[in-house]
A protein has these predicted regions:
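Charged, compositionally biased N-terminal leader segments and the immediate start
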Residues: 1-33, 228
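Juxtamembrane/transmembrane-helix interface segments of polytopic membrane transporters
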Residues: 19, 23, 27-31, 155, ...
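Hydrophobic alpha-helical transmembrane segments of membrane transport/permease proteins
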Residues: 20-70, 167-182
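Transmembrane helix irregularities
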Residues: 34, 146-149, 250
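Alpha-helical transmembrane segments of integral membrane proteins
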Residues: 3-6, 98-135, 151, 175-336
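Short membrane-interfacial helix/loop motifs at transmembrane-helix boundaries
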Residues: 55-96
Length: 336
């Protein structure tokens, strides 16, 4: 692994850390200025059953009687050490509340991503091997059609068709296999349209290159050409698409959980908003920002390893820098 790549990785890591810190501070400020007093609406709500002594202990433990800047410092310090604080509503650790529902959301998001990849690559494959007179135009219209379709519309349609009309699953059992399956499809279809749009465009571009024309002149058919020549170079941008849309994927998962009535991070967010449980809401949003930044960081670090053209660019920049420092033209002894 070259020094240029290590420098690049260290720079991207530093940028990611700064973005995470700024995202946490921004989230804290936004949550702090939300209308309403959580002490009155949550702690002093008779339905929650807190005594005055318990209220005083919670206020002192969470530092709610401290200035905002002090609260921010303590909150950020605790977050960086893995302490997500306590829920004002249940007086339980926020990390415990998230851990109870996170697996369900992760399973749904992973299932949706799997559906999206399978569907996107299938559609892209069809655009390269299916003759135009046999429906290739419909396959090429797939991204445009579903990019503009909200996922909750797809979810409601699937619930109506397969839940009420065909009765394939019971709507009151949102965690059943079929409910999870259709929830994954709800997430996967719009996401697959984004991937397919990029993949089809790159496949068309690669198909026009000289190496593809040479392969066709040697008698290689569309299926083999797709598998052995076009797929790999055209698939590299998909890594970037997935990284850039991971936030949308998680957001769609939360919306889909609400539509299908599933227990997950979405239901926890909904409950936290309705009860003004600000510590829970703040940590969920902050963790979402961390996931988004980390996934994009991984994509940035992987891309130079997956695409030789990116490595050449990194190396070329380093060679130019060394040549400039030595006042020598490239190729006269400057070592990369």
């Amino acid at each position: 692994m070259s020094n240029a790549y290590l420098t690049y990785a260290a720079k991207r890591l530093g940028q990611a850390i700064v973005v995470i810190l700024l995202a946490y501070i921004f989230t804290f400020v936004v949550v702090s200025i939300l209308p309403g007093d959580p002490i009155t609406s949550v702690l002093r709500n008779p339905q929650n059953g807190f005594t005055e002594q318990e209220i005083a202990e919670i206020i002192a433990a969470q530092g709610l009687d401290q200035p905002v800047i002090v609260q921010l410092w303590h909150s950020l310090s605790s977050f960086l050490t893995g302490d997500l604080g306590m829920s004002m509503r249940s007086n339980r650790p926020v990390s415990t509340l998230i851990a109870e529902v996170l697996p369900s959301t992760l399973v749904l998001a992973a299932s949706g991503l799997t559906v999206a990849l399978i569907l996107a690559f299938t559609v892209a494959y069809g655009t390269q091997v299916v003759p135009k007179k046999y429906g290739q135009g419909l396959l090429r219209a797939f991204p445009s059609l579903f990019l503009s379709t909200p996922n909750f519309v797809i979810g409601l349609f699937l619930i109506h068709l397969f839940g009420f009309q065909l009765r394939l699953f019971r709507v009151i059992e949102p965690d059943s296999f079929w409910a999870t399956f259709f929830a994954a499809i709800t997430i996967g279809i719009p996401f697959s349209a984004q991937i397919a749009e990029v993949l089809i465009a790159n496949l068309d571009h690669e198909a026009e290159q000289d190496y593809a024309a040479v392969a066709r002149s040697r008698g290689i058919g569309p299926k083999r050409l797709f598998a052995t020549h076009l797929l790999k170079p055209a698939s590299l941008p998909v890594v970037t698409v997935i990284a850039l849309t991971v936030g949308e994927l998680l957001g769609n998962s939360l919306i889909t959980e609400t539509v299908f009535g599933r227990t997950g991070i979405g239901s926890l967010v909904q409950r936290s908003v309705s009860t003004q449980d600000l510590p829970v809401l703040q940590e969920i949003v902050s963790l979402g920002a961390v996931v988004f930044v980390v996934v994009n960081l991984i994509a940035d670090l992987l891309y130079p390893l997956l695409d030789p053209r990116v490595k050449i660019i990194i190396g070329a920049k380093r060679r130019e820098s060394i040549a400039d420092d030595a006042s020598l033209p490239l190729g006269t002894g400057a070592k990369p």
